[in-house]
Swiss-Prot record:
Organism per entry: Sulfolobus acidocaldarius (strain ATCC 33909 / DSM 639 / JCM 8929 / NBRC 15157 / NCIMB 11770)
Its EC number(s): 4.3.2.1
Main location per the UniProt record: cytoplasm
Domain of life of the source: Archaea
Molecular-function GO terms, alphabetical: argininosuccinate lyase activity
Family, similarity comment: Belongs to the lyase 1 family. Argininosuccinate lyase subfamily.
UniProt keyword terms in alphabetical order: Amino-acid biosynthesis, Arginine biosynthesis, Cytoplasm, Lyase
UniProt name for this protein: Argininosuccinate lyase
Length: 447
């Protein structure tokens, strides 16, 4: 044990407080963070070029993260460096704390995950728009209170989902910018006597800026909770979609046919088409909300400053995050392959059309409404309008009217393309800034 100079060195105590398992997620980010720190020590004239070179080479050669014997990856990495290059390796501890380094590594890893998720979310929204274009005239019933309401189209339903997913997109992009602030150089809580250029370190790691207050830098996890909250918004939309698919594909409703690849049969009952992927998706959403709840429950009672409780939050970040991309993939595949079945006359689906036509012709709407309701109750209602005509008559913005919906699709497609371009530019700026670290590292190692 490199750091444990007080307390027990018994294996069961060390393993109880160790973060080794969750640290496996951030090994590369911890190495990257330490390299930025070593480069900063060199650029600030605290260590020689030769020492910096030796340390960076040792960092790069750290491949096999031991599963035991250390409190965390930071201790394992520093011990590895010292064992490989001698006491000179101990310079990595100058102006550094695990508190600011783990916070930095967590932000780097989360940033990469958000990059990946937003790219997948873009593809999902793009698929919704593309499928909406193809299904402007694919008629289906809409539902309120899960009772048949009025005729609509599959395109209208797809554009509803696209609109719902716009909110998580905006929330995620905002979360990304909050995550992309650097804690590095904050020390344990109040900074360090070592005159580290925190802004230069931030630039090397692709951050937008530093997270200024050093108490916040080292002990705040509010930006991570915010990011997970944004992801649960996304998963919430997917969960409602999953519920729609389960209900609408059931034999009781039988409006939608799910792709064969997304259903399975029973081991006993050969007629079954169980919507298994949608059932699992609902479960993953529940797990994400459990993770968010755990994060808030851990965080709510902590005094300011770093507490080891914070390391127990890490596993909940990764658990939720790792459910998101597979859930998006499953959703996109269903959207691209869904089929609406032919369905017959649904009693009363155009009842509102008749009541509104009567009102437009001069009868007060409530009187027309009661008249139509009485006909439905007596079983004498006759639909005087086709589903297609009913949809065409809805000439209000946001309706399933094909002409208006085509205009909406064009507007939403332009919005999505603009959002994606803005996101790409942001991601490219991060990559470009991080290139400086590689240039400096290469320069050191080649000399």
């Amino acid at each position: 044990m490199l750091y444990r100079r007080w307390g027990s060195d018994k294996d069961f105590v060390i393993s109880y407080t160790s973060s080794n398992e969750s640290d496996k997620e951030i090994v590369e980010e911890v190495k990257l963070t330490l390299k930025a720190h070593v480069i900063e020590l060199y650029l600030s004239n605290y260590i020689s070029k030769d020492t910096a070179k030796k340390i960076i080479r040792a960092i790069n050669s750290f491949k096999d993260y031991p599963s035991s014997g250390y409190e965390d990856v930071h201790e394992a990495l520093e011990d590895y460096i010292i064992k490989n290059i001698g006491e000179e390796g101990g310079w990595v501890g100058l102006g550094r704390s695990r508190n600011d380094h783990v916070a930095t590594a967590l932000r780097l890893r989360t940033r990469e995950y958000i990059f990946d998720i937003m790219e997948e979310l873009y593809l999902l929204r793009k698929s919704l728009i593309e499928q909406a274009k193809k299904n402007l005239n694919t008629i289906m019933p809409s539902y309120t209170h899960f009772q048949p309401a009025q005729p609509t189209t599959l395109a209208h339903y797809f554009m509803y989902l696209e609109e719902e997913l716009n909110t998580p997109w905006e929330a995620l992009f905002n979360s990304l910018k909050l995550i992309n602030r650097s804690p590095l150089g904050s020390g344990a809580i109040v900074g360090s006597n070592v005159k580290i250029d925190r802004k230069r370190e931030a630039e090397l790691l692709g951050f937008d800026d530093v997270l200024y207050n050093t108490i916040s830098s080292t002990s705040s996890r509010i930006d991570f909770i915010n990011a997970i909250s944004s992801l649960t918004l996304l998963m919430l939309v997917l969960s409602r979609f999953a519920e729609d698919m389960i209900l609408l594909s059931s034999m009781f409703v039988n409006i939608i046919k799910l792709p064969d690849s997304h259903v399975s049969t029973s081991s006993l009952m050969p007629q079954k088409r169980n919507s298994v992927t949608m059932e699992i998706l609902r479960t993953k959403v529940g797990e994400c909300y459990g993770d968010l709840s755990s994060l808030m429950m851990i965080y709510k009672g902590l005094p300011s400053g770093y507490n080891l409780d914070l390391q127990e939050m890490n596993k909940h970040y990764w658990n939720c995050i790792k459910h998101v991309i597979p859930s998006i993939h499953i959703t996109r595949d269903i959207i691209q392959n869904i089929q609406i079945k032919n369905f017959g006359e649904i009693q009363g689906l155009t009842a509102t059309d008749l009541a509104e036509e009567m009102a437009i012709s001069g009868i007060p709407y409530r009187k027309a409404y009661i008249d139509v309701a009485n006909k439905i109750k007596a079983g004498t209602f006759v639909a005087g309008i086709s589903y297609t005509k009913s949809i065409e008559n809805k000439k209000v913005i946001g309706s399933p009217n094909p002409s208006l919906l085509t205009q909406e699709i064009e507007i939403k497609e332009k919005r999505l393309n603009n959002q994606h371009e803005k996101f790409k530019q942001y991601k490219e700026s991060v990559i470009e800034k991080m290139g400086q670290l590689g240039v400096i590292e290469d320069g050191l190692l080649q000399q």
